[in-house]
Curated annotation (Swiss-Prot):
TM helices/strands, residue ranges: none
Chain residue ranges for the region called Disordered: 521-548
UniProt source species: Shigella sonnei (strain Ss046)
The protein's name: Probable malate:quinone oxidoreductase
Gene from which the chain derives: mqo
Annotated Low complexity bias: 530-541
Pathway(s): Carbohydrate metabolism; tricarboxylic acid cycle; oxaloacetate from (S)-malate (quinone route): step 1/1
Cofactor(s) the protein requires to work: FAD
Amino acid sequence: MKKVTAMLFSMAVGLNAVSMAAKAKASEEQETDVLLIGGGIMSATLGTYLRELEPEWSMTMVERLEGVAQESSNGWNNAGTGHSALMELNYTPQNADGSISIEKAVAINEAFQISRQFWAHQVERGVLRTPRSFINTVPHMSFVWGEDNVNFLRARYAALQQSSLFRGMRYSEDHAQIKEWAPLVMEGRDPQQKVAATRTEIGTDVNYGEITRQLIASLQKKSNFSLQLSSEVRALKRNDDNTWTVTVADLKNGTAQNIRAKFVFIGAGGAALKLLQESGIPEAKDYAGFPVGGQFLVSENPDVVNHHLAKVYGKASVGAPPMSVPHIDTRVLDGKRVVLFGPFATFSTKFLKNGSLWDLMSSTTTSNVMPMMHVGLDNFDLVKYLVSQVMLSEEDRFEALKEYYPQAKKEDWRLWQAGQRVQIIKRDADKGGVLRLGTEVVSDQQGTIAALLGASPGASTAAPIMLDLLEKVFGDRVSSPQWQATLKAIVPSYGRKLNGDVAATERELQYTSEVLGLKYDKPQAADSTPKPQLKPQPVQKEVADIAL
């Protein structure tokens, strides 16, 4: 008995020693001006802005995985589109009278121009190197079939000609012309099928993972920047002086460390919601999250890859979320061209591809459970869509592919699981809760902590999103002459709109194209098209949108 007691005592002492060691390690507090949680493109972009704006500020980045850009920013975990609304039909909804609304498309395009300018500036500074490694010219096309859809595309094309941002777009209903643009899409198609397409030569394919890695590599060259990998945030606590003490666990050796930060950015993708909740700020109580994953069919067969050089987006079917539009894309990943088709929605309770099955449950609180229930009850069509997607067979996915590639062969394609996208659910006074497409910066009133929630358009608008964050959190500094001058050097069009100013639009497109090695020819006259018939649209229940 004495031996057992002694053994238990020894074990207790040993465990206590381990615990004390961990606490001692945690008490060794590191101080930093800015703490960036998450090693993705958002944290990398914000860190790059702040490095130019305040080069003396110290920064620490913590990432849970063993490398940066391994979740949604990774090139294989997203569609790699430079979202500028050149082909994405969901950004130009049709009004009840049949007319087309282009406001959202203009806003998306303006945002992407900011990203292009930001990247071009970083290339000129030597922060980003070899533009071809992360951005390439890939024409953007919209492609539809059927009388109603063709009429919609006519109306969309005509409406977009009102904007200086969409000059140079081509339009055709001719099979031969569309085949020249996208042979893979047209070969084997019924020659009597009514089709239409638009094409913009200045579209892009972007490897956001490569951008992230290069931005962070540049930050690491400075002595006042620290990158901590395999490091998971376990707790966030506000101090009396409005700084934050963040407890970070080393996942390799089990020790913990406290980091005291003046400003905390939570750019952890799907994990951002849970960390925002952990902070305890009242603003977090308005939000919940719902995870949706995406799958793509991938072909690396040279006969397929070399026969297709475009991103071709279709139109979402009735009853499906507008953002679920199928597309068949040329991708350039790690210097190699591949073709992707999708997305197909998947469901998992994980908030990250490398997350936990408990993520959804652990983020559900007494504050957000009712908004989540309201969203579920109010969006039954969306629930039906997700169920139907999860139930798709291999044959179903292949048949969907053949609508865009009639001569596709099964043996040329494999299925790839891309990243998780956590959709924003926000408390709403009228509806109880609403599903919000897009991204949203959530911060405390003091401007000491901010998180980015949401998924779309995401990485392609990282530069303007982080500009919005700077204005929201560092408003006084942003209005100072020093910051204004620096921001206008980084983003020449900062503070003004390009839309409506043909000369300014062409100047910025020419500049970014030259620096980034992209194709750009001055736009020619618009194509003549049949006049669209503006028919009143039948009233249909709106389907909430989601990002895949």
